[in-house]
Amino acid sequence: MVAAARVVSGVKAEGLLRGACAALAAAAALLLGLSTQTETVLLVRKKGTVKDVQALWVLAMAAASAAGYHLLQLLKCLYLGRGGGRALAWTCLLLDKACAYATFATTVAAAQACVVALDGAHALQWTKLCNIYTRFCEQVAGSLVLGMLAAVGTAVLSAASARNVFRHYYCSSHSPPAPPPETCDAH
């Protein structure tokens, strides 16, 4: 009875964290993808968008993909719980790791591109862009924070997936017949 309650609370915690990661990644993608600013520079109107910096565009696509992945995993968690075999547990672990690495790498790459936009690169004669597109840069900074929070949450989820994988092996290594892995249906 206590083990079943633990599993249900673990599934609820995983579902809550997956929902939070999906919301953070979706918010990062939307904030980044929808932010634009038009300014007049030397009598020429210029529009700053996310497509101007390729690292930001890649971050928007990666964050949107991560949000979709977390929604699919949330549905899996709601309908299957912790049920499923070792193959499903390994697949979830590998996909969680890939999502965590991709989200973290694209967020850090976009942050590096934003540092150039913030400070400029004097050796390359690149001017500071955030002096011109202030609101756009603030929105990008907000999306970077949201993307990093989503990456950290995904890393925590990959640790939970690893625990789920090794729990399958722990149950099968004992000599008495172990009960099958718990599912949400056990409550």
From Swiss-Prot:
The residues exposed to the Extracellular compartment are: 36-54, 119-139
The protein's matches in InterPro entries, at most eight in alphabetical order, are given as: CASP/CASPL, CASP_dom
Q: Which GO terms describe its cellular component?
A: plasma membrane
Q: Keywords assigned by UniProt?
A: Cell membrane, Membrane, Transmembrane, Transmembrane helix
Topology relative to the membrane: Multi-pass membrane protein
**Where does the record place it?**
Cell membrane
Pfam families, from UniProt?
A: CASP_dom (PF04535)
Q: Which residues lie on this side of the membrane: Cytoplasmic?
A: 1-14, 76-97, 161-187
**Main subcellular location of this protein, as a coarse class:** membrane
Residue spans crossing the bilayer: 15-35, 55-75, 98-118, 140-160
Q: Which family does it belong to?
A: Belongs to the Casparian strip membrane proteins (CASP) family.
Q: Which domain of life is it from?
A: Eukaryota
Q: How does it assemble?
A: Homodimer and heterodimers.
NCBIfam families in the record: A_tha_TIGR01569
Q: What is this protein called?
A: CASP-like protein 2C1
